[in-house]
């Protein structure tokens, strides 16, 4: 069973926390992590790209010159794909790129990402994180005490004060435990979680 150090907001170690093997101690499956990241990026795509075919380009209704007798090549429209300014053949059109991996694969990918952070020592657990009001300066102080400047900050539930305090700090992203995804975990150097967030992750993804 993996254990991690438990810190207070002053950056001092106040104990250790045992993590569940089935969440934070699984074998890291890199191909599954790759699949999960590709899925996440595909699902973020808007898919609004578009090109006009010869029937959609403005103009080109009249035959540019008669079929025979001019000595020039025969053409029926100035919007043929052969012409500059003409339509596009087989160009991109709006489409939906989103898809979903099987639930078991998604869960395995998330557990692999969390386990990878534990293995590399890039997970920090806070005993408690409470702010009376949104205060970016106070959040920056806490992160500085932890020697963190690029991290995913995970809370157990939606915490307006923490979210508003952290969202203006560069390279820091606040997120709720139930909304964790593989891409965010891997995209940031450190994973900073509250003790309650760890319990919530173990409850939701067990």
Curated annotation (Swiss-Prot):
Pfam families tied to this protein: Ribosomal_L4
Gene Ontology cellular component list: ribonucleoprotein complex; ribosome
Annotated Gene3D superfamilies: 3.40.1370.10
Positions of the UniProt region annotated as Disordered: 48-77
Compositionally biased region (Basic and acidic residues): 48-59
GO molecular function annotation: rRNA binding; structural constituent of ribosome
UniProt biased composition (Basic residues): 60-77
A biological-process GO annotation: translation
Signal peptide: none
Disulfide linkage: none
Keywords on record: Ribonucleoprotein, Ribosomal protein, RNA-binding, rRNA-binding
Family according to the record: Belongs to the universal ribosomal protein uL4 family.
Subunit structure: Part of the 50S ribosomal subunit.
Function: One of the primary rRNA binding proteins, this protein initially binds near the 5'-end of the 23S rRNA. It is important during the early stages of 50S assembly. It makes multiple contacts with different domains of the 23S rRNA in the assembled 50S subunit and ribosome. Forms part of the polypeptide exit tunnel.
Entry protein name: Large ribosomal subunit protein uL4
Native source organism of the sequence: Pelotomaculum thermopropionicum (strain DSM 13744 / JCM 10971 / SI)
Top-level taxonomy: Bacteria, Bacillati, Bacillota, Clostridia, Eubacteriales
Gene assigned in the entry: rplD
């Amino acid at each position: 069973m993996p254990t991690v150090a438990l810190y207070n907001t002053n950056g001092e170690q106040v104990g250790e926390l045992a993590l569940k093997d089935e969440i934070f101690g699984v074998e890291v499956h890199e191909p599954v992590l790759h699949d999960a990241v590709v899925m996440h990026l595909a699902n973020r795509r808007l898919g609004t790209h578009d090109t006009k075919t010869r029937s959609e380009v403005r103009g080109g209704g009249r035959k540019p010159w008669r079929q025979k007798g001019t000595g020039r090549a025969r053409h029926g429209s100035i919007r043929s794909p052969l012409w500059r300014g003409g339509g596009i053949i087989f160009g991109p059109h709006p489409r939906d790129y989103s898809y979903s991996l099987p639930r078991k694969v998604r869960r395995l990918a998330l557990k692999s990402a969390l386990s990878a952070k534990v293995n590399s020592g890039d997970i920090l657990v806070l005993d408690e994180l409470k702010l009376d009001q949104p205060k970016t300066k106070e959040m920056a102080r806490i992160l500085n005490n932890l020697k963190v400047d690029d991290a995913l900050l995970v809370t157990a539930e939606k915490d307006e004060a923490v979210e508003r305090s952290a969202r203006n700090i560069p390279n820091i992203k606040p997120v709720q435990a139930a909304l964790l995804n593989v891409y965010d975990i891997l995209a940031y150097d450190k994973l900073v979680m509250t003790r309650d967030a760890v319990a919530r992750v173990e409850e939701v993804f067990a």
